[in-house]
């Protein structure tokens, strides 16, 4: 477990950590505001799948921004290392959480449950991998994040048919934002690239929030 609690290779400077924690702190506040909006909208519609999906998405959104904000805000200590692992693990959970309102509330049926099962199995495996292996193999984990995010392409036909076109637009925009941000995440040895990654994450989450709110609940 000592190896599992190693920090990332290049420690972030104080200025970088301030930018990192503030950026995702703002994301956390936005997620806390978005939570009741999503759940209320789903409850008003009265659909169980949509309500469960919106709740899961909202919870995983808050978890990611909370873990990230605390990790970057804390000074170097054991708690910081723990929150770094939670931060990386929460990415798996948010990806699966983003799928959930669409798989349970829109796709349903065989494709809905297949995608739901696949992404959540991958999320659980990824989380366990992070818990046991820590933040090593970051590049490998990033490719897994991207593969999970674009896994939806295996169900492109039913998704294209059942998700309204503007819903597809916001889903695609969010996916592109996350993917573009991953480039900066993998090149975070360059100063403030991790902060740029954070900005892309906030943008991607905002796009997916609109997709869920307007087209999945």
Where are these regions (language model features)?
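Multi-pass alpha-helical transmembrane bundles in non-GPCR membrane proteins
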Residues: 1-217
């Amino acid at each position: 477990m000592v190896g599992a609690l190693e920090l990332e290779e290049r420690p972030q400077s104080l200025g970088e950590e301030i930018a990192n924690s503030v950026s995702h702190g703002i994301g956390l506040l936005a997620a806390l505001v978005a939570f009741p909006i999503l759940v209320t909208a789903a409850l008003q519609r009265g659909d169980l799948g949509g309500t469960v999906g919106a709740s899961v998405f909202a919870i995983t959104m808050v978890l990611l921004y909370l873990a990230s904000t605390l990790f970057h805000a804390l000074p170097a200590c054991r708690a910081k290392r723990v929150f770094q692992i939670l931060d990386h693990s929460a990415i798996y959970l948010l990806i699966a959480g983003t799928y959930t309102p669409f798989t349970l509330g829109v796709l349903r049926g065989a494709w809905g449950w297949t995608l739901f099962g696949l992404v959540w199995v991958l999320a659980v495996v990824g989380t366990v991998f992070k818990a046991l292996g820590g933040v090593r193999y970051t590049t490998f984990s990033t490719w897994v994040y991207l593969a999970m995010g674009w896994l939806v392409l295996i169900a492109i036909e039913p998704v294209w048919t059942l998700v309204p076109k503007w819903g597809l637009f916001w889903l695609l925009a969010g996916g592109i934002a996350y993917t573009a941000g991953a480039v900066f995440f993998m090149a975070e040895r360059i100063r403030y690239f991790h902060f740029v990654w954070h900005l892309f994450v906030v943008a991607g989450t905002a796009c997916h929030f609109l997709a869920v709110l307007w087209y999945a609940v």
